[in-house]
């Protein structure tokens, strides 16, 4: 069965009369303290402390609590960012189990260690600056539903790295096969699902570019500004994603199975930005192609989200400053422009209707 068209109820997106009603989000600044210290040539320790006057229940993905090779810090050399060589992962946020959260009582601290050379090339050696800031989604103590996001901004850490020693650290990610747009892992139903999701991402991105061009209220909701520069940056990125959403060209390669072994139980897909490579995880194939639920997750917006992470599409590429609608609403304007989930949530915001013709 071929997907011949996807129609998005588009008047609702273009008309400000149907704009999304913003609910008040919990105030969560200053409740989380993260202190970075050097404990080796390229190893650092993060001490995460609950400074709030109440218990915190923090989502463990895409931060220091996550054992996957996700971006936990930013690294700078002579003022320039060092390329991140790990993964950005897209997490399934529905029916989260208890084990997906880390609980901290008031005043409690947890320590985590990471070798930053596993996901960055530090062989040049010398002085590096390490920083970390962002938002961690949280749930209330008696619930597993994410209701807000906790902001954090760690101290800047200066490190003097021995490049020769850094070169001996094993990398978390190995080079991938670039000979094919869809690798030989893409066969049968998984190939069909992936191709359809890529096609749907193209149409969704094209329409989102039109909405960004014409709906100032929606642009303000997600990107915090409506000036011409902001509008053009958003339109350009959606247009680039639409252009890249193809199986006949482009620079992104796809794995339809997890050959590298980085899918966690809740991971929908993940991207290797340094290699412009996307891997679908088992949950991806259990999701609908497109959902009618506002800010719901589906295959098409997952592809859209992952493509924004690839630097071959638009530079600088998107990162994961905030995850989920609550976190996205807390980002400032500059963070919003560089946040992958802002684009996928914009694309399937309230009043989006999809009709399939086969």
Swiss-Prot record:
Residues 1-19 form the signal peptide. PROSITE patterns: ZINC_PROTEASE. It comes from the Eukaryota. Its cofactor is Zn(2+). The keyword Lipid metabolism does not apply. InterPro entries: Fungal_M35_metalloproteases, MetalloPept_cat_dom_sf, Peptidase_M35. One of its GO terms (biological process) is proteolysis. GO terms for cellular component: extracellular region. It catalyses: Preferential cleavage of bonds with hydrophobic residues in P1'. Also 3-Asn-|-Gln-4 and 8-Gly-|-Ser-9 bonds in insulin B chain. The active site is at residue 306. Binds 1 zinc ion per subunit. Its EC number is 3.4.24.39. Disulfide bonds join 186-256, 263-281. It is an enzyme of class 3 (hydrolase). Its main location: secreted. Keywords: Cleavage on pair of basic residues, Disulfide bond, Hydrolase, Metal-binding, Metalloprotease, Protease, Secreted, Signal, Virulence, Zinc, Zymogen. The keyword Acetylation does not apply. Transmembrane segments: none annotated. Zn(2+) binds at residues 305, 309, 320. PANTHER family: NEUTRAL PROTEASE 2-RELATED, PTHR37016. Belongs to the peptidase M35 family. Secreted metalloproteinase that allows assimilation of proteinaceous substrates. Shows high activities on basic nuclear substrates such as histone and protamine. May be involved in virulence. This is Neutral protease 2 homolog MEP8. The gene is MEP8.
């Amino acid at each position: 069965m071929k997907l011949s068209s996807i129609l998005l109820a588009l008047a609702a997106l273009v008309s400000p009369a149907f704009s999304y009603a913003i609910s008040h989000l919990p105030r969560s600044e200053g409740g989380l303290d993260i202190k970075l210290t050097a404990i080796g040539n390229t190893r650092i320790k993060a001490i995460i402390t609950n400074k709030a006057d109440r218990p915190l229940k923090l989502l463990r993905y895409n931060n220091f609590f996550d054992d996957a090779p996700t971006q936990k810090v930013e690294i700078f050399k002579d003022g320039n960012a060092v390329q991140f060589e790990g993964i950005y992962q897209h997490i399934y946020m529905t029916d989260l189990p208890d084990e997906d959260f880390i609980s901290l009582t008031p005043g409690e601290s947890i320590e985590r260690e990471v070798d930053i050379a596993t996901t960055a090339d530090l062989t040049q050696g010398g002085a590096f600056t390490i920083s970390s800031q962002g938002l961690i989604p949280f749930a209330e103590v008696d619930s597993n539903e994410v209701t807000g996001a906790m902001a954090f901004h760690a101290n800047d850490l200066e490190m003097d790295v021995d490049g020769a020693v850094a070169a001996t650290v094993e990398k978390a990610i190995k080079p991938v096969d670039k000979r094919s747009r869809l690798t030989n892992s893409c066969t049968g139903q998984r190939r069909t699902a992936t191709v359809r999701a890529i096609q749907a991402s193209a149409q969704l991105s094209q329409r989102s570019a039109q909405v960004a061009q014409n709906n100032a209220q929606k642009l303000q909701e997600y990107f915090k500004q409506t000036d011409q520069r902001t509008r053009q940056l958003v339109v350009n990125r959606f247009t680039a994603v639409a252009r890249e959403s193809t199986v006949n060209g482009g620079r992104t390669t796809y794995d339809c199975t997890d050959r590298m072994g980085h899918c966690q139980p809740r991971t929908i897909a993940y991207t290797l930005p340094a290699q412009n490579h996307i891997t679908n995880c088992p949950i991806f194939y259990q999701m609908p192609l497109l959902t009618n639920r506002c800010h719901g997750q589906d295959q098409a917006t997952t592809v859209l989200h992952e493509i924004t992470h690839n630097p071959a599409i638009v530079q600088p590429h998107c990162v994961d400053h905030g995850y989920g609608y609550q976190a996205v609403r807390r980002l400032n304007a500059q963070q919003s422009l560089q946040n992958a989930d802002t684009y996928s949530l914009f694309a399937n915001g309230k009043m989006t209707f999809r009709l399939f013709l086969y």
